[in-house]
Amino acid sequence: MKISDIRKTFDNFSLHIESMSLEEHKIYGIIGSNGCGKTTVMKIMAGLISPDSGKIDYGGISQRDMTMVFKKPYLMHDSVMANLIYPLKIRKIKLDMQMIEHYLEICDLVDLRQQYAPSLSSGQQQKLSLVRALVFSPRLIFLDEALSNMDIESVAFFEDYILKLQKTSPTTWVIISHQLSNVERLCDYTFFMHDGKVEAEGITEEVLQSPSSDNLKRYLQYS
């Protein structure tokens, strides 16, 4: 996937991304202060909002092969089980109950499968949102602070799970997080955004340990 010269203007904010490229089978991080444009560029990548101008080359990936998980879970007003089955139903993918059971175990909701999903705790809802995004084996997954409502143990578990999936599937991940420990552990490559632009990018270890701009230095100092 490659985006070129993307622009998006709101009343009090302007986004301009000259170039961002994503390779298959890698995990990317996007970091930066609140309001710098991280979520906006992610929504543009995911096809949820349209840029005012610019080019997006998905490299053969359709929007049905992409999914996005937000900090605030967006769940159906239905059972846990119905939420897991829904992505398969709308894509007309054959239901595999063994796989569904696997994901119920992953999010530790086996005994709550018939519970009304919005009544779950915030951490449980976040887990359900994340595994719901995985059930149809998407090629591109966007996580917008999707681990932020989980306890430390759950975060570590899902970090391990994401790294395990990366080794066995061609999925590309794009992760926004204010927890630099998440980015450092998970991401192969990281973009730093400031004021609507990508100001620094590179191998994650180099970006975090050898900041190339004053804004990045300040961000790392206070994060």
Predicted segments, located by residue:
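Conserved ABC ATPase signature
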Residues: 116-120
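Conserved ABC ATPase "signature" region
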Residues: 97-112
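C-terminal boundary and immediately downstream tail of ABC-type ATPase nucleotide-binding domains
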Residues: 205-223
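Helix-to-loop junction immediately C-terminal to a conserved catalytic motif
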Residues: 46
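Catalytic Walker B motif of ABC-type/P-loop ATPase nucleotide-binding domains
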Residues: 141-145
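H-loop/switch region of ABC-family ATPase nucleotide-binding domains
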Residues: 177-178
